[in-house]
């Protein structure tokens, strides 16, 4: 389930951002695919998606069998990381800039790097979120300008 708290054209919806609540599992790859669909209709030439993540995709629903892998698999660990990284690459291939603010365990640092590469800022406290997002935005502006 992907809940839009504020639409691109919504001029008065800032307060709804605070309606967010964690509701269970996080199938990151699917959420990224959904964001890609939403961003296609966004009225802008350039798109930047910044995520707050623990880099630990996990879902109770298994990954369905495919031609390469005939058995279903759990959506956690390496399969979840691989799926999420593939969706990040797909968004970037569509021209959507993807960056992440990582607030997770030390054991998840390799996953964060595998998924987001150099477009990543780590924070240890939530009060560092705005500064980290600001740095990522500045990096993107510099890259687009240079």
Predicted feature residues:
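Acidic, glycine-rich A-domain
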Residues: 1-146
């Amino acid at each position: 389930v992907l809940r839009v708290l504020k639409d691109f054209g919504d001029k008065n919806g800032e307060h709804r951002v605070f309606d967010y609540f964690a509701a269970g599992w996080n199938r990151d790859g699917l959420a990224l695919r959904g964001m890609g669909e939403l961003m296609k209709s966004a009225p802008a030439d350039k798109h930047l998606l910044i995520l707050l993540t623990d880099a630990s995709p996990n879902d109770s629903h298994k990954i369905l069998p495919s031609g390469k892998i005939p058995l279903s698999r759990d959506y956690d660990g390496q399969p979840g990381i691989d799926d999420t990284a593939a969706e990040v690459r797909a968004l970037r291939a569509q021209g959507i800039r993807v960056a992440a603010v990582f607030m997770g365990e030390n054991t998840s640092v390799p996953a964060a790097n595998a998924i987001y590469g150099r477009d990543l800022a780590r924070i240890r406290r939530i009060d560092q979120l705005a500064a980290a997002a600001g740095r990522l935005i500045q990096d993107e502006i510099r890259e687009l300008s240079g």
